[in-house]
């Protein structure tokens, strides 16, 4: 009889553990569900606050408002003398938190002089 009781306690403990894990997963899923999506305006504000001398910013949500795919163009003299990699890193650092929620992200960075040659 003592052996049966110990076995039942083990089963109950396993059930409690599995129930606890399931509950944790549901709470995590619920928390993810209520997060605000990334917006064009939010990305624009983050970039403007992090990168000095911003001349022009174009943020386009390619996911039709879902906040999952963005195309960004940043024009600033801050990029003068910096390689494409360093420019992209500066923008990525500015939107680091938002990048965790985004599925696709494209960024093009130009100086004012380079931008004036592109846009005629």
Swiss-Prot record:
Localization in the cell = Cytoplasm; Nucleus
- GO molecular-function terms, A-Z: 2 iron, 2 sulfur cluster binding; iron-sulfur cluster binding
What GO cellular-component annotations does this UniProt entry give? Answer: cytoplasm; cytosol; iron-sulfur cluster assembly complex; nucleus
Q: Which GO terms describe its biological process?
A: cellular response to iron ion; intracellular iron ion homeostasis; iron-sulfur cluster assembly; negative regulation of transcription by RNA polymerase II; protein maturation
Annotated keywords: Cytoplasm, Nucleus
Q: Which domain of life is it from?
A: Eukaryota
Tell me what else is known. Answer: Present with 2050 molecules/cell in log phase SD medium.
State the protein's purpose: Involved in the regulation of the iron regulon in response to decreased mitochondrial iron-sulfur cluster synthesis. May be involved in mitochondrial organization and biogenesis.
Q: Could you describe the subunit structure of this protein? A: Interacts with FRA1, GRX3 and GRX4.
Task: Provide the protein name.
Answer: BolA-like protein 2
In its UniProt entry, the species of origin is given as Saccharomyces cerevisiae (strain ATCC 204508 / S288c) (Baker's yeast)
Question: What gene name is listed for this protein?
Answer: BOL2
């Amino acid at each position: 009889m003592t052996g049966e009781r110990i076995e039942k306690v083990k089963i109950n403990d396993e059930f409690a553990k599995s129930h606890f894990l399931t509950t944790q997963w549901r709470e995590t899923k619920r928390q993810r569900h209520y997060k605000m999506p990334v917006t064009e305006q939010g990305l624009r504000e983050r970039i403007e606050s992090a990168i000095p001398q911003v001349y022009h910013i174009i943020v386009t949500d390619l996911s039709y408002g879902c906040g999952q795919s963005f195309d960004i163009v940043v024009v600033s003299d801050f990029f003068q003398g910096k390689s494409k990699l360093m420019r992209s890193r500066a923008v990525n650092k500015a939107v680091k938190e938002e990048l965790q929620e985004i599925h696709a992200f494209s960024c093009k960075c130009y100086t004012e002089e380079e931008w004036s040659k592109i846009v005629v």
